Amino acid sequence: MLQILFGDPNERKIGRYKQIVNRINALEEEFKQLTDKELQNRTAIFISDISKNADLDNVLPSAFAVAREASFRVLGLRHFDVQLIGGMILHEGKIAEMKTGEGKTLVAILPAYLNALCGYGVHIVTVNDYLARRDAEWVGQVPKFLGLSVGLIQEGMTQEERKNNYSQDITYTTNSELGFDYLRDNMAILLQDIVQRPFYFCIIDEVDSILIDEARTPLIISGAGETTEEKYVQASKVSLNLVKNLHYEVDEKARNILLTDSGIVESEKQLECKDLYNVQNPWASYIFNALKAKELFIKDVHYIVKDSEVIIVDEFTGRIMQGRRWSDGLHQAIEAKENVPTQNETQTLASITYQNFFLLYPKLSGMTGTAKTEEAELDKIYALEVTCVPTHRPMQRKDYSDLIYKNQYAKWKSIADECLDMHTLGRPVLIGTTSVEKSELLSSLLKEYGVPHNLLNAKPENIKREAEIIAQAGRKGAVTIATNMAGRGTDILLGGNSNYMAKNALNILLKEVPSKSSFTKNDPQLQSLHSFLLNKIESYEIDDDELETKISIACEKGFTEDALTITLRAAYQILIEKYSSLIKKEQGEVIALGGLHVIGTERHESRRVDNQLRGRAGRQGDPGSSRFFLSLEDNLLRIFGGDKIVNLMETLRVEEDVPIESMLLNKSLESAQKKVEAYYYDARKQLFEYDEVLNYQRLAIYSERRRILESNNLRDWVIQYAETTIEDYIEHYFDKKHSMPNSASEVLDKIEDLLGLPYDLDPMYFETLSTSEAKNFLYQQVRIAYDLKESQIDLIENGLMRELERSFLLQKIDSAWKEHLQQMNSLRESIGWRGYGQKDPLIEYKNEAYDLFTSMTTNIRHSVVYLIFRSQPILKN
């Protein structure tokens, strides 16, 4: 009703942006007439205006018009009006929902250029190193042309390289590199070791993937912990002897294990221990993890085993997460289950969730093809509003209703039949699967059917060809199996992708012997190019790795002055022209057949991920279609669907190989997905609420560390620590003064011991003092003791006291914080049980976390004061 009265709020917002688009378009002819130099000079004019407090919103129309003209001159790409709208949404610190193929990468350049004019640095975040490098080298040429600097952060870079790249006006990086650099900066011992500048503006590509899907996985830097391999192995053996529903129950919704009374007794019997929960010799966590590994974590679904190592598979992208480990002993339990070497437990040194990390930016924005379904969460946790950007061309994709089968066998047979039909027609098909295991099941089925296909899953041998496989998934007759959203970031072009075909051809021409090459047979142009390239390479002394690097650079659009790379790029352009004409013909045939057909093999727990898969078809107004094939044995229906669906199938007496298309079933499916989304949203919200408590403490500790690093003289800092410690003692003394006759002697003994005073303090004199007099008297003793200690230390080396102050302060803060993180983790694990005592676990957690933090800060002060005042200089002969 409100929408009828007031109209669609999204359309009203777009209407406001269109007015600004008209202003940008009005400047287009003027900027077209400018020379390159004149266009580049506009950057200096904008910077000057902003330094005089010009509002960025007022600069926006001119800055966007300049960036659009520069993009056309440098890349040959002109921003469409809808891309200008996307840029405005990002500039305002919102999320722009833009469909697949609408040019998000190009859109990010507009707000990045505008905001970089302020001089504080803009971060553009992508999901992997490849995309970060591709975008920096390709669209990064636009701000470079306009006089701004562009940086790139990649895995394996040195500290100096990182520092240099973060200092640029616009920096491309990945979410994990950015987060880990933040944590490492807050563990730095020297100010010059810090690589990042203060945060200003961040644009996140695939924002839903990072802020929603990865929100439950904290970034953790850890150090070596205890070695308890035997316990994991023993617990794994015990778990094999425990019987499901007798000794333990599995809660698949919560992904948790509940041990029954008989399970506790049986475990204690097999382990020959009296109490699983004994604090001195705890076994409970080992048994729980062993059972989780047995029941909830499946090989080739949740992880793969490669070279005797358990590697996590990202449940949302299907990619392997090399170097990432499950925490709290779960990873070791899975290693024991798979009978591979169990790595040592680790102790957390620093951690942060993506939720709290990205909230550190004063201005945050993001782009994705699918955010509307998570709008409430993005607004509540990140205060990010989602605005849908209209497509440049009308959407033509047909989304067919789901086909639901009684069992898995009938479903997979039907999928294979559909693939065969499409392949026979010549229509390209992309099949999305939810795990490595299921992708390989379908692959073996298609082999039986004689259907040629490409397989893309988390297995390393497949992942190497990821971009190439996805890029060619739109060719006539192509059949591509991909786990989840593998290949996200690479467009599927109907008829194929001439760039990838040209790159592949260039690789073959450079590596095949002319006399043995079947590739160049009957093609004089390729034969001529083959001979020319091989003669050219012979004049350079270059190994295969170097050649591979030069081919990669030649096939990208970044600037290069290397002679061989320029030659390779020229050859690459010739090959692109050759394949473009071939593709144009094939593209017309594929369009006539109906475009790309996407098959979903299971509904994901999130509607958003289903929409991402569907979104691979019908890009930029192309035709396309999608259909999901489901079975009652699929996890979503089995765990969350309830008995309603099963009863309906039984009532209808449906044959196993006959699918059902039913509005009631579709509603039940959507209801099941909403239940799961609500469940995981609650889990992320709870994680956020608990981590927010730790986050306030983290910010306090990190800001204290930073002030210590930036301070040239920490004398007053240590004296303040000492005075606060003295205050604690005095307050305790005056509380106990009347009830404890010897309290003056006791408190003065402690203070003498703490400060290492070379003389005794008089208890009788002390008892005559008021509280303020006692404080002033002891503060005076602190300064006397400190002056004495400083003169002793500086006898060894002048200025040594200043170095000791910084070293002791950082050392104690870091060690105390490490212990505190462990205590907070233990508190978090145990606090849930308070709910059974009619107490709110979150309030209990906040109260106890505050007590732990207060205790930690007191401990830091006491330890630093003791270390400095009691340190004994050793003079060399």
From Swiss-Prot:
UniProt keyword terms in alphabetical order: ATP-binding, Chloroplast, Membrane, Nucleotide-binding, Plastid, Protein transport, Thylakoid, Translocase, Translocation, Transport
Enzyme class: translocase
Record membrane topology: Peripheral membrane protein
GO terms classed as biological process: intracellular protein transmembrane transport; protein import; protein targeting
GO cellular component: a single term: cytosol
Listed Pfam families: P-loop_SecA (PF21090), SecA_DEAD (PF07517), SecA_PP_bind (PF01043), SecA_SW (PF07516)
InterPro entries for the chain: Helicase_ATP-bd, P-loop_NTPase, SecA, SecA_CS, SecA_DEAD, SecA_motor_DEAD, SecA_preprotein_X-link_dom, SecA_SF2_C
Reactions catalysed according to its record: ATP + H2O + cellular proteinSide 1 = ADP + phosphate + cellular proteinSide 2
PROSITE patterns assigned to the protein according to its UniProt record, in alphabetical order: SECA (PS01312), SECA_MOTOR_DEAD (PS51196)
Residues holding ATP: Q83, G101, E102, G103, K104, T105, D491
Principal cellular location given in the protein's record: plastid
Cross-referenced HAMAP family: SecA
Protein name: Protein translocase subunit SecA
Organism in which the protein naturally occurs: Rhodomonas salina
Source taxonomy: Eukaryota, Cryptophyceae, Pyrenomonadales, Pyrenomonadaceae, Rhodomonas
